[in-house]
């Protein structure tokens, strides 16, 4: 199954951007996933291609117009009725690995990228958008946030990351949340040594060290991700 992504934006030239590089870009070139970028402005009907207007009730900034965005969405739905509609928003549910895993199983998703002060709320309510946030901070638009979401989904698709163990052992995928510390050659650098267990050749001890490291790092930095009932085993 090919993972199809539709992007609704007023800045289509921003794509594929970072999605055109590394394993994500290679997967795009191989057809493992497809990217369809749609310019919202092309659905504006006035000569100036206006996509925004002043907010009712007053307030700073401009709001993206429901009629223009609605026409763009209708165009997508005319050929992809089952697409999952997503809006990148600081008010949305916070993105995590579980959400990415769920979305990666869809054959078609459509991401709406807002700009200015946001979009007319009626659009989100009428089409029942799933709102997603990538963190508690504000960006100038949804394009960069959509790239984050897409990458987290695409790399979970079989065939994108060649080493399956890489995904299994990563932060938020491994049993205890955050990934253990990683090292490579040289074994000694500026007086700092690689942990001796990692060069011991004893795979049982190495695996235990990785589990302990993962748990300790998670407990220190993201304690809400740890299972306190099992904690003593890994101290």
Curated annotation (Swiss-Prot):
Ligand binding (S-adenosyl-L-methionine): 114, 134-139
A Gene Ontology term for the protein's cellular component: cytosol
Keywords, in A-Z order: Cytoplasm, Methyltransferase, S-adenosyl-L-methionine, Transferase, tRNA processing
EC number: 2.1.1.228
Catalytic activity, reaction form: guanosine(37) in tRNA + S-adenosyl-L-methionine = N(1)-methylguanosine(37) in tRNA + S-adenosyl-L-homocysteine + H(+)
EC class of the enzyme, as a word: transferase
InterPro entries assigned: Alpha/beta_knot_MTases (IPR029028), tRNA_m1G_MeTrfase_C_sf (IPR023148), tRNA_m1G_MeTrfase_TrmD (IPR002649), tRNA_m1G_MTases_N (IPR029026), tRNA_MeTrfase_TRMD/TRM10 (IPR016009)
Entry superkingdom: Bacteria
Pfam families to which the protein is assigned, alphabetical: tRNA_m1G_MT
Alphabetized SUPFAM superfamilies for the sequence: alpha/beta knot
Entry keyword annotation includes Lipid biosynthesis: no
GO terms for biological process, alphabetical: tRNA N1-guanine methylation
Record's subcellular location: Cytoplasm
MF GO annotations: tRNA (guanine(37)-N1)-methyltransferase activity
Family of the protein in this entry: Belongs to the RNA methyltransferase TrmD family.
Function field: Specifically methylates guanosine-37 in various tRNAs.
Subunit structure: Homodimer.
HAMAP family hit by this protein: TrmD
Database matches in PANTHER family: TRNA (GUANINE-N(1)-)-METHYLTRANSFERASE
Designated name of the protein: tRNA (guanine-N(1)-)-methyltransferase
Lineage, highest ranks first: Bacteria, Pseudomonadati, Pseudomonadota, Alphaproteobacteria, Rickettsiales
């Amino acid at each position: 199954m090919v993972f199809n992504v539709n992007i609704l934006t007023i800045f289509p030239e921003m794509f594929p951007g970072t999605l055109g590089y590394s394993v994500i870009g290679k997967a795009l070139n191989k057809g493992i996933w497809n990217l369809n970028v749609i310019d919202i402005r092309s659905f504006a009907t006035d000569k100036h291609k206006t996509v925004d207007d002043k907010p009712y009730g007053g307030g700073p900034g401009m709001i993206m117009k429901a009629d223009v965005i609605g026409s763009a969405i209708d165009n997508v739905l005319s050929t992809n009725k089952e697409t999952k509609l997503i809006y990148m928003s600081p008010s949305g549910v916070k993105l995590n690995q579980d959400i990415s895993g769920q979305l990666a199983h869809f054959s078609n998703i459509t991401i709406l990228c807002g700009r200015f002060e946001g979009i007319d709320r009626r659009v989100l309510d009428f089409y029942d958008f799933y709102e997603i946030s990538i963190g508690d901070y504000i960006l100038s638009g949804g394009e960069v946030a959509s790239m984050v979401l897409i990458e987290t989904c695409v790399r979970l698709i079989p065939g994108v990351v060649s080493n399956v163990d890489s995904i299994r052992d990563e932060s938020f995928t491994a049993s205890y949340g955050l990934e253990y510390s990683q090292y490579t050659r040289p074994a000694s650098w500026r007086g700092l040594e690689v942990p001796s267990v990692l060069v011991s050749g004893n795979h049982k001890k190495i695996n235990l060290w990785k589990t302990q490291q993962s748990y300790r790092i998670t407990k220190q930095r993201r304690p809400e991700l740890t299972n306190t009932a099992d904690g003593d085993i890994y101290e």
